[in-house]
Amino acid sequence: MTPQTLTVKTRSTPVVEMDTEAGAAYVRFKRAKVERTISREGPGPIVAVDLDATNQVIGVELIGVKVFNLPTLLRQSAIRAPHIDPALTRYIRASKQEVQPAE
């Protein structure tokens, strides 16, 4: 079953945080408090979409990706961003956070 397409309403330039070793990416459309996260089921990568209190898309995480460009990531996550120019997207390496051992 194909997930319903979500639309990004912000006009802010997105930032794509990439972890090519893990095949993961996070596309951040805006900074806001995440109210809830929904998973998108379908063929392809594992997709989780972060939403704010008004159900607007904050960002989307994809795991199991091989191509790291905005149009492909949006297509794989069933998200439209009509007000965003993919050419302006910033791509950065995801920061590695140290895992703290359990005490």
PLM region descriptions:
Residues 1-103:
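Small, basic N-terminal interaction modules of short regulatory proteins
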